[in-house]
A protein has these predicted regions:
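Catalytic domains that recognize anionic headgroups
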Residues: 1-170
Length: 172
């Protein structure tokens, strides 16, 4: 809802008629973020809605991020479980890279900056005897409900708002 009500928004999702899996890589948002940060001299609130690690995982990262191989699962079953996990891990690795780049952009300015990241769901990757896969099942598993999140604060943020960030950092 925040995204739809923003004064200015940039949507890099597929155009109407394209498949949802045709989303562009999350890294395509980085030049837009760099431009927004560079062109403002006032307060700025940015929401980056990343597509992240969704099936087909191999389409969620550039080929040069294929660190865990083989990652070419053409089907999802017990026999391809390791390939599926490799592709998923590569997508996580790419997300880590994108978040590192976002932090670099925020850290490169003298502004008071912060980042909050939170996944919207976890994922089943045939992690137990039930061999469940994906998310959004009627009875969610631990793997679907466990989501990663973190907060990052610039040095300037911590200097100016030390008590608040210390309290937040100590509450995890």
């Amino acid at each position: 809802m925040l995204f739809r009500s923003a004064d200015q928004r940039v949507d890099i999702s597929p155009r109407e008629g394209q498949l949802y899996t045709d989303n562009r890589p999350d890294g395509d948002m980085l030049p837009i973020l760099r431009q927004a940060v560079a062109s403002t001299d006032s307060s700025l609130f940015v929401v980056l809605h990343m597509y992240g690690s969704h099936m087909d995982y191999t389409k969620r990262y550039p080929k040069d991020f294929a660190f865990f191989t083989p990652d070419d699962a053409s089907a999802v079953n017990r026999e391809t479980k390791d390939k599926v996990r490799n592709a998923y891990d590569n997508s996580i690795r790419y997300t880590d890279y994108v978040l590192d780049q976002v932090i670099s952009v925020l850290d490169s300015t003298d502004a008071v900056t912060a980042l909050f990241f939170c996944s919207d769901h976890g994922e089943d990757l045939m992690d137990d005897d039930r061999n469940r896969f994906l998310h959004a099942s009627p009875t969610p598993t631990y793997y679907q409900l466990h989501v990663d999140s973190f907060a990052w604060f610039s040095d300037r943020y911590r200097e100016l708002l030390d008590r608040k960030s210390t309290r937040l950092n100590s509450s995890h």
